[in-house]
């Protein structure tokens, strides 16, 4: 596979990197896969760490980043109890097409623990179609997305572990309202949603 490619997740990389650049500092990419987003974050962050549980993906990400000293790829599970003590907190925490692989509410709580004061959590996620409205919106997007995919020469299979989402967007909103009540969630193009949450500045 080419080092650079496009798909429905990569479509969000530019805005994620632009957002991270406003804070600089350090970035954590949870479920970093082959390291493409992590590599792009190194252009705007002094330190970039990727977490991935798939050993083959970790090997690919490390090859991609072998000449990037400020990047580190860890074969690790974000839900491990001692992870926050081991890796610390980050100005930007990203989680692209990964949250639906994890237990939703515990994962939201854990991701928030990894965000530094004044930092931001950025989730790009997939939601299950459960309501009539969900199905209608997905159906309306089919043709436009095929056109966009053809224009970008979409790469559908990048050789990483995938699974279908379990929770609907309504269920994700409800969970976020309990765990991260200030989170901003929006349905997006590309069968995705975004969740953004800012940790307040620490008051002395």
Segments predicted by a language model, with ranges:
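Conserved alpha-helix/loop element of class I SAM-dependent methyltransferases that forms part
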Residues: 7-25
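Conserved class I S-adenosyl-L-methionine
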Residues: 25-33
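Short conserved loop adjoining the S-adenosyl-L-methionine
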Residues: 80-87
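A short, conserved alpha-helix within the catalytic core of class I
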Residues: 102-111
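Conserved beta-strand signature within the Rossmann-like core of class I S-adenosyl-L-methionine
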Residues: 118-125
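C-terminal alpha-helical "lid/dimerization" subdomain adjacent to the S-adenosyl-L-methionine
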Residues: 127-175
């Amino acid at each position: 596979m080419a080092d650079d490619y496009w798909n429905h997740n990569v479509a969000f990389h530019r805005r994620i990197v632009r957002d991270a650049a406003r804070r600089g500092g350090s970035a954590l990419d949870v479920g970093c896969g082959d390291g493409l987003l992590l590599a792009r974050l190194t252009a705007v962050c002094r330190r970039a760490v990727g977490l991935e549980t798939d050993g083959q993906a970790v090997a690919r990400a490390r090859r991609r980043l072998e000449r990037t000293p400020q990047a580190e790829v860890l074969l690790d599970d974000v839900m491990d109890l001692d992870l926050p003590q081991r890796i610390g907190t980050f100005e930007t925490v990203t989680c692209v097409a990964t949250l639906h692989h994890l237990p939703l509410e515990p994962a939201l709580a854990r991701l928030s623990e990894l965000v530094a004061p004044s930092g931001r959590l950025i989730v790009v996620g997939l939601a299950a179609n459960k309501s009539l409205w969900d199905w209608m919106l997905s159906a309306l997007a089919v043709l436009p997305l095929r056109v966009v995919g053809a224009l970008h020469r979409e790469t559908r299979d990048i050789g990483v572990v995938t699974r279908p989402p379990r929770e609907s967007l309504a269920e994700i909103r409800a969970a976020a309202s309990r765990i991260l009540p200030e989170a901003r969630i929006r349905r997006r193009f590309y069968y995705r949603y975004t969740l953004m949450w800012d940790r307040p500045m620490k008051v002395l």
